[in-house]
Amino acid sequence: MLAKRIIPCLDVKDGQVVKGVQFRNHEIIGDIVPLAQRYAEEGADELVFYDITASSDGRVVDKSWVARVAEVIDIPFCVAGGIKTAEDAAKILEFGADKVSINSPALANPELITELADKFGVQCIVVGIDSYFDKETGKYQVYQFTGDEERTKATKWETKDWVQEVQKRGAGEIVLNMMNQDGVRNGYDLEQLNMVREVCHVPLIASGGAGEMVHFADAYNKTNVDGALAASVFHKQIINIGELKDYLAEQDVEVRR
């Protein structure tokens, strides 16, 4: 059995790590490189960095901090933010990232997924999906430009359909960002994860809702996700990654030590 991954998520805005609640009201957490270093030392399996306003600002993620992160950590990391071309992706990978993740640019140009997968290999192409449960319709809808509160909008895609579409186009991994749960620390949306898992045949990473160690165990044991991504519980030192791995091992979850 493959070990389950613990993945701290660092949202980057104006050169600093920030965290919001349900993708709004972001507060500054701290500097990028020291936080990355801390998580690597605590035992994180990999890191994910989202430049949350790059797409809505029409720019590519700032590559200077990508190089600095690569110098100080020895675990894989993934970078997202305004990657619209193969050239954009190549530069980020050259600066030291192991994977690139695309979200809003993939919605704007789905062919980009195939282009990147063909050029760099599916193993380093991640598609992030921001999924919102609309209580009025009872459906999970994909949203775009979620890093900018004023530009956030629903797309034509229902989550399950988009998950299937991105796989056809070459996504090597999917990060499911569950917007309703983001930052509220009440647990992952297990129902949604199981729905997506049914049609997802590449590694699936749960994102949004972790507040206690049991939430990670539930995600792994009840939905069979490959990794769990979290931010505020790590940023605010509510959960220590080493202690989390000890706990998960006791819950019969295979983790890297």
From Swiss-Prot:
User: EC top class, in one word?
Assistant: lyase
Among the Pfam families in the record, one is His_biosynth
Biological process terms from the Gene Ontology for this record are:
L-histidine biosynthetic process
Q: Which InterPro entries match?
A: Aldolase_TIM (IPR013785), His_biosynth (IPR006062), HisF (IPR004651), IGPS_HisA/HisF (IPR050064), RibuloseP-bd_barrel (IPR011060)
Annotated Gene Ontology MF terms? imidazoleglycerol-phosphate synthase activity; lyase activity
Q: What is its main location?
A: cytoplasm
Q: Subunit structure, per the record?
A: Heterodimer of HisH and HisF.
Family of this protein: Belongs to the HisA/HisF family.
> What name is this protein filed under?
Imidazole glycerol phosphate synthase subunit HisF
Originating species: Aliivibrio fischeri (strain MJ11) (Vibrio fischeri)
